[in-house]
Regions:
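Helix N-cap motif at beta-to-alpha junctions
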Residues: 227-233
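Acidic, Ser/Thr/Pro-rich beta/coil linker or hinge segments at domain junctions
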Residues: 238-277
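Glycine-rich anion-binding loops of enzyme active sites
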Residues: 22-23, 29-31, 59-141, 247
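General beta-strand structural signal in soluble alpha/beta enzymes
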Residues: 6-10, 23-25, 92-96, 110, ...
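Short, compositionally biased
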Residues: 139-158
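Extreme N-terminal cap/leader segments of soluble proteins
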Residues: 1-34, 56, 65, 83-94, ...
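Small-aliphatic-rich amphipathic alpha-helix that forms the alpha element of a beta-alpha
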Residues: 37-63, 77-88, 158-166, 182-188
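Active-site-proximal betaalpha loop/short-helix elements
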Residues: 155-221
Length: 277
């Protein structure tokens, strides 16, 4: 169990390090993406780890990367994307490890600081669900309907403002939207809190270029799902758009409430199988 997070943080986006305010996150990029789109893989390795820290309310300190590549040219393309993202976010790459002559693979560890990390499992029935998302940008070329790219066009101050949203708002629970999409990530947040969730489809902030079906299931670049007492203020989040769009309820899974009042099942049960945090 200790490999999955400490008490109260099981399955969380990042792990508080005992004895201080250090928070660590580690994510790997799908190898096929590292192979066919190395610059984007490098950028995303920074993006997803900083999003993980942000979901805990942690301010980033630095990054470590572990890269494997078939050759030096391929490795350079991955590292170029990684370095560009690190500069864009204003977060240093502290070091890492590179191995050549092997299949492509990439993993990044991010370190941050948070005196009081925000858990993913702090939501309870009756809490309002809020989505804070960057609706700028568009579909990444080659990933239409699957990966939305808003971050590569943002300034450093905009990126850092979005990363600070959870720390500023301090909700009861927070999760950054991952490859599971909005629906799947909300399922993770609800599962960690031992409850279910209902999402009001019409209230979900969404870019005009994305269908609702794609938006609820894609990787949206920057998006945070939070749960808190009804009436809690929207956090300052730079260019991101924020709206209450659902609530946590008793039970399990995620339901979608459509504008005509019909309710359909989006997630039938546990997403991770880790249970309550």
């Amino acid at each position: 169990p200790h490999a999955l997070g400490g008490p109260g943080f099981v399955g969380d986006d990042a792990a508080p390090v005992p004895g201080g305010d250090l928070v660590a996150a580690c994510d790997a990029i799908v190898p096929s993406m590292v192979e066919r789109d190395p610059e984007w893989a490098g950028w995303c390795s920074v993006l997803v780890n900083l999003n993980d820290l942000a979901a805990m309310g942690a301010a980033p300190v630095g990054l470590l990367d572990a890269l494997a590549a078939p050759g030096a040219a391929h490795a350079a393309r991955v590292l170029d994307g990684l370095a560009r993202a690190a500069r864009a976010y204003g977060v240093p790459v502290l070091g890492g490890h590179t191995q050549l002559g092997v299949p492509a693979a990439l993993s990044v560890t991010a370190l941050g600081r948070a005196a009081r990390p925000v858990p993913g499992g702090g939501g309870r029935p009756g809490h309002a669900v809020r989505l804070t998302a960057d609706l700028g940008g568009g579909w990444r070329a080659g990933y239409r309907g699957r990966q939305w790219d808003s971050t590569t066009s943002r300034r450093t101050d905009e990126l850092r403002a979005m990363l600070g949203a959870v720390a500023a708002g301090r909700p009861a629970a927070a999760k950054d939207v991952s490859m599971a999409g909005i629906a799947g990530t909300l399922g993770m947040l609800a599962e960690a809190g031992g409850c279910a969730a209902v999402l009001d489809v019409a209230a979900v902030p969404r870019p005009a270029a994305a269908s609702m079906g794609d938006w609820l299931t894609c990787f949206p670049g920057f998006a945070m799902l939070t749960a808190d007492q009804p009436g809690a203020s929207a956090p300052p989040a730079g260019p991101a758009v924020s709206a209450v769009c659902g609530e946590l309820t008793t039970g399990r899974g995620v339901s979608l409430r459509w504008p005509d009042g019909e309710v359909t099942e989006a997630v039938g049960g546990p997403v991770t199988g880790l249970g309550t945090a």
